[in-house]
Structure formats: C-alpha cells, structure tokens
From Swiss-Prot:
Subcellular location: Cytoplasm
GO biological process: tRNA modification
Function, in words: Catalyzes the formation of N(4)-acetylcytidine (ac(4)C) at the wobble position of elongator tRNA(Met), using acetate and ATP as substrates. First activates an acetate ion to form acetyladenylate (Ac-AMP) and then transfers the acetyl group to tRNA to form ac(4)C34.
Name this protein carries in UniProt: tRNA(Met) cytidine acetate ligase
Organism, as annotated: Lactobacillus delbrueckii subsp. bulgaricus (strain ATCC 11842 / DSM 20081 / BCRC 10696 / JCM 1002 / NBRC 13953 / NCIMB 11778 / NCTC 12712 / WDCM 00102 / Lb 14)
Gene name as annotated: tmcAL
UniProt enzyme class: ligase
GO molecular function: ATP binding; ligase activity, forming carbon-nitrogen bonds; tRNA binding
Organism domain of life: Bacteria
Length: 384
C-alpha cells in the first residue's frame, strides 16, 4: 500500500495546496492520503486564521483522506522540530511517501538530508550574536553540502529530509515544484496561486469574499463568511501586554525558549510599544528572527513553560480531525498497527495527558477569541 503523507498548516487552504494534493493523488492512486496539520496555532507564532476543523474539512474536500492534528509542541516550532513532529507522526500512521512543495524539486533532498543528519551536534551550535541562528545554520549547511539553500520551502523540505534521515529514512521523499506566488510575497492578482501570507493579509484588511474565489475553495470562503472575528496578533496584543506587565521576571524565565535576558527586554519594551508590530521591532536584534520572537510571544501569552513542552513529549498522541470513506476504511484496517494513540474524543481524563493536555489548555484562548469549542464535544468530521 502506497500511503502518501503531507505535513501542512493550510492557513488558509488555497489553490496551491489543492495543486499539491492533486500531485499527491497521482502518487497514491487508490491508496489513502494522510495530512498531518497544525491545529489552531501555527509555526510562525500566530493563531490560525481559521479553526482547525474548517481547515481539515477543506483538505478532505480537496482530496485528502485523513487529517490528523500536529501537536502544539511540534507545530509552533522552528523548521527542524516542526518537520520532526510531522515526519514522525506520518511514519507512525503508516505513510510510506512524503509529498511536499519546493521551489526546485530537482534538488536531491534525500542525499542532502543524510549528509546533514551526520553532522555532529556540537558543530550546529553557534555563538555569533551578530547573526540569527537560522542564518548561521544555513551557512553551515551550504558549506557541508556545497549548495546554498535559501528559499523558505526548500529550507523546510531540507528539514523534512533531515528528520527522515534521523528516523532511519522510513519515508520516500517526493518534492513537487511549487506554482504561483512565492512565500510571503505581496498579492499578485493575475497569479493562479497566491501565497498564504498574501491571502491572510487580504482577509485581515477586509477584502470582499468575491475577491478570493479564484484562490480559495468555496467551502473555505463559506467558513470565513460564518466567522465573526479572524484571529490576529493585533487583537491579542492587549492580552500579551497584560501578561508581561503582570508576570514577574522569575515567572517569565520559566517560559519555553525564554533565554539570554529576553525576559527583561520583553518586559521593558511592552510599556512603550503601541501595537504588536511595534513591539516586535523594539525587541528585534540580529540574534533573533521575527518568527522566533513571535513564537516566544505566543509561548508567553499562553504561559507555556519549558516543563510543559518537555512533559508533553512523554505521551505523544494525535487528534483525528476529519476523514473520507477511504480514510475510514484505512483506519478500520490499520489502526491496531499504528504506533501512536489516536484521539477521536476529548474527555476529562485524556485532556490531562501529554501533547493532548497541552493542546487542550492552549486552545482555551482560541475558543475565547472565536467563540466556539475546539475540543470538548467535538468529533471527527466525515466528509464524503
């Protein structure tokens, strides 16, 4: 069985994701496509613009057969941990092939991933404070493999390859050339595919839904029509300000990835910042990327500590969000062989455990923002 896996955020699901899904179907044939998707919080350190259930439905309607939630402690992370979580989950769920979009599918990701995975860990520790960790890491990679990888999706593809190599290469890697606008580019109205960032900006700036019809599926547009509020950092900024002003330095030092005196910088600059964008500019330095600072801001807002994240890894589970008829058949046949607990219903007992417990806790804020329960009382969506 040639089960194909995809690691994604679908923030939101758009025509570029649909193209990749179609390419995955060419590989899978009649076998299932499994998507491991970030929940209500995404890698760049933000709330997803649409809840996980709506995004999972769009994925199934576009051709996926099963959508599982990537736990928060992997989803809101730098590329290496994000990729590790996604590849590990897909492997445990029986996937044999990983399909992902990149700027140049001709790169030998399996070879590069194997090379990088063998670099001693001590050579991946950097002390040049004039550059970000990611910049220094990319420079090291270029030296080791003799090829500079700088495009965002290629960097993530390389992270998948390294994670796969570290796990013993259980997945065949199938990179696919991206189409349309690049990552984080401004809106290009003539383009068949827009970047997710451009679409989010359009939505947050009050675009008419009719403007989005060429880039978003009808079901996704209908979901946006039903939303009273679209989560974003400017909406959350007052809560972050309260959190930083009310917490002690000692409390802030317990926050996951709070290091090198950033707790003092955060606490000092929050008083002066007019909004979240201004706050990020004030705390930015050559040492940290904006993505790292957004993630740290999110950990702070949600009071996610180092202990919370480490403890969550003691019991890793995944929540089934949506499935097709083909997906249901695959689950029935293979579930007993999966090397991971699949959660179909959150109850008072399992809501205290591992990655699920952390996810349920952080989702509480998302629920307050959007006004809808995200875990208790929810069951996987069957989409035909």
């Amino acid at each position: 069985m040639s089960v194909v896996g995809i690691v994604a955020e679908y923030n939101p699901f758009h025509s570029g994701h649909e193209f990749l899904m179609n390419q995955a179907r060419l590989i899978a044939g009649d076998d299932p496509i499994i998507a491991v998707m970030s929940g209500n919080y995404v890698q760049r350190g933000e709330m997803a613009i649409l809840d996980k259930w709506s995004r999972a439905r769009s994925a199934i309607e576009a051709g996926a057969d099963l959508v599982f939630e990537l736990p928060f402690s992997y989803a809101v992370q730098a590329a290496d941990m994000f990729a590790t979580g996604g590849v590990d989950l897909l492997t445990r769920l029986g996937a044999k092939n990983l399909v992902f979009g990149v700027e140049d599918a001709n790169l030998n990701f399996e070879y590069f991933g194997d090379r990088i995975s063998k670099i001693p860990r001590q050579r991946q520790e950097f002390a040049d404070y004039s550059q970000t960790y990611s910049t220094q890491y990319n420079q090291m990679v270029a030296r080791e493999i003799g090829h500079e990888v700088s495009e965002p999706n290629a960097i993530l593809g390389l992270a998948y390859a390294v994670a796969n190599a570290n796990l013993g290469s259980p997945l065949k890697l199938s990179p696919v050339n991206r189409v349309g606008a690049g990552h984080d580019e401004i809106l290009q109205r003539e383009a068949v595919v827009q970047s997710a960032s451009a679409i989010r900006n359009l939505l947050l700036n009050g675009a008419e839904r009719s403007e989005l019809e060429q880039w978003l599926p009808k079901g996704e547009i209908a979901a946006f029509d039903q939303e009273k509020v679209l989560p974003n950092w400017e909406l959350l900024f007052p809560f972050l300000k309260y959190r930083l002003e009310s917490a002690s330095i000692k409390e802030l030092q317990q926050i996951y990835q709070m290091s090198e005196g950033l707790e003092y910088k955060f606490k000092a600059e929050i008083h002066l910042a007019e909004n979240f964008a201004d706050f990020l500019r004030r705390v930015k330095s050559k040492r940290y990327t904006y993505s790292r600072l957004r993630r740290l801001s999110l950990y702070t807002l949600l009071n996610v500590t180092e202990a919370d994240v480490l403890n969550s890894y003691d019991h890793v589970s995944t929540m089934l969000l949506a499935y097709s008829k083909r997906g249901r058949k695959y689950l029935k046949q293979q579930r007993k062989d999966f090397e991971i607990d699949i959660v179909s219903k959150v109850d008072r007992k399992n809501a205290q455990e591992g990655t699920l417990g952390l996810k349920v806790r952080v989702d509480r804020l998302f629920e307050q923002i959007v006004g809808a329960d995200q875990n208790f009382g929810r069951r996987p969506l069957e989409v035909n």
